[in-house]
């Protein structure tokens, strides 16, 4: 039985919708995003631990990392569950795209449903930048927009 989820991204200048679909617990999750207001370039795109936006995106906590791993690229074995890499904005129109990820899930104990999706100001260095926060945040910078991931039809 497939599951779907949706997240409405809100920020001062950044807004959008992220949709998640997973056919079954063993299949990858398809992530479709449509976001406006991003400056040209790459922007970190992560699932954060908490579904709390009471203090803006800051209250979403760190990246979703139930296995205590270092930050990494979506293709890395050693990565946070919430590490979805970067999305690329042209700075002129909606930033749209699709990601397929085999680590996040809409099923089970480590579901991303109820957690927060965050779009960051800077490029995620995928844990390889050698900066003090590369292995925790990918040095992706400020949180421009976020929203709680909820169940959808």
Curated annotation (Swiss-Prot):
Top-level taxon of the source organism: Eukaryota
The residues listed in the UniProt record as binding Zn(2+), with positions renumbered to this chain, are 63, 71, 80, 83
Keyword Metal-binding included in the entry's annotation: yes
Induction comment: By H(2)O(2) exposure but not by UV irradiation.
Question: Which catalysed reactions does the entry list for this protein?
Answer: 2 superoxide + 2 H(+) = H2O2 + O2
* One of the Pfam families matching this protein, by short name: Sod_Cu
Binding site residues for Cu cation: 46, 48, 63, 120
> SUPFAM superfamilies, per this entry?
Cu,Zn superoxide dismutase-like
Described by its record, this protein's role is as follows:
Destroys radicals which are normally produced within the cells and which are toxic to biological systems.
Q: What family does the Swiss-Prot or TrEMBL record give for this protein?
A: Belongs to the Cu-Zn superoxide dismutase family.
Q: What is this protein called?
A: Superoxide dismutase [Cu-Zn] 1
Please name the source species.
Dictyostelium discoideum
Q: Name the gene that codes for it.
A: sodA
């Amino acid at each position: 039985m497939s599951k779907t989820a949706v997240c409405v991204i809100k920020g001062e200048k950044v807004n959008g919708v992220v949709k998640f679909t997973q056919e079954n617990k063993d299949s990858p999750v398809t992530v479709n995003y449509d976001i406006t207001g991003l400056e040209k370039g790459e922007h970190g795109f992560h699932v954060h631990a908490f579904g709390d936006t009471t203090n803006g995106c800051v209250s979403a906590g760190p990246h979703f990392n139930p296995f205590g791993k270092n930050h990494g690229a979506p293709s890395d074995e050693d990565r946070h569950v919430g590490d979805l890499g970067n999305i690329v904005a042209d700075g002129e129109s909606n930033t749209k795209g699709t990601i397929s990820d085999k680590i996040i899930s809409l099923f089970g104990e480590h579901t991303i449903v109820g957690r927060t999706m965050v779009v960051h100001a800077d490029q995620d260095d995928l844990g390889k930048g050698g900066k003090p926060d590369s292995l925790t945040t990918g040095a992706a910078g400020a949180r421009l927009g976020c929203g709680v991931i909820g169940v959808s039809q």
